[in-house]
Amino acid sequence: MIDFSLYLITDRNQTGGRPLLEVVEAALSGGVRAVQLREKDLTPAELYDLAWEMRALTSRYDARLLINERIDIALAVEADGVHLGVNSLPVTAARRIAPDLLIGYSSHSVGEAVAALAKGADFVTFGPVFPTPSKAAYGEPVGLGELERACRQAVGDLVFGLGGIKRDNLAQVTAAGCYRVALISDILAAPDPAEAAGAFRRGLGC
């Protein structure tokens, strides 16, 4: 069961020099209820240590923790789930290894989204919806029209819009029929992450 609508993805390079855990805690205090730990430049040992700290923090706020790609670390720290992508372990293999973990999947087309859910993913992120530096490698944004199509053709309630989503364009996302979003910078880089998280929750009606 996906019991969150605002999905925060970490990037400690976007916190303006503030400690990542401090910024994430502020976001949690503002209402974030799911965090994906995504720090790809860390060694496995460093990521493991940070994951334990993030697990303790999210547990205090009764929030979900998912680990990007590393199902071994997700299991080791008793995270709630793992987030996979096209170059990760296949969804079907992850489900065999960890039948009780939440599995998220990064999709960049309607076909990818539908296929991932059919293979056992619990939810998908879909994008990039708008231009964003963090998703430049995936080419041009898919746009709001494709997001709307993804929500119609996949199970709409299991699709999180991703990529360049900010408080000032959130209404366009919900108008496309998407009431779940994943994001990085508009919370992590905000002067007040708690206030930013609260604004997103209000905009999503959650």
List the model feature ranges, each with a label.
Residues 1-91, 96-122, 149, 155-159, ...:
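Conserved N-terminal beta1-alpha1 strand-loop-helix module at the mouth
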Residues 37, 74, 130-136:
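A short acidic, helix-capping loop that chelates divalent metal ions and anchors anionic groups
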Residues 72, 145, 182:
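Active-site phosphate/pyrophosphate-handling residues
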Residues 135-150:
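Substrate-recognition "cap/lid" segment bordering the active-site pocket of phosphatases
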Residues 137, 173-174:
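Residue-level detector of alpha-helical segments with a strong bias toward transmembrane helices
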Residues 163-164, 177:
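A short glycine-leucine-enriched loop at secondary-structure breakpoints
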Residues 174-186:
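Short, electropositive alpha-helical surface patch
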